[in-house]
From Swiss-Prot:
The keyword Secreted applies. This is Caerin-1.7. The modification Leucine amide is found at L25. GO terms for cellular component: extracellular region. Belongs to the frog skin active peptide (FSAP) family. Caerin subfamily. Keywords: Amidation, Amphibian defense peptide, Antibiotic, Antimicrobial, Secreted. It is found in: Secreted. Coiled coil: none annotated.
Length: 25
């Protein structure tokens, strides 16, 4: 379902987004 797709997308993007968030904090 949609949530499964969103979950996999979030898992894929998290490693790229986390360092950016860490830099801003």
């Amino acid at each position: 379902g949609l949530f499964k797709v969103l979950g996999s997308v979030a898992k894929h993007l998290l490693p790229h987004v986390a360092p950016v968030i860490a830099e801003k904090l």
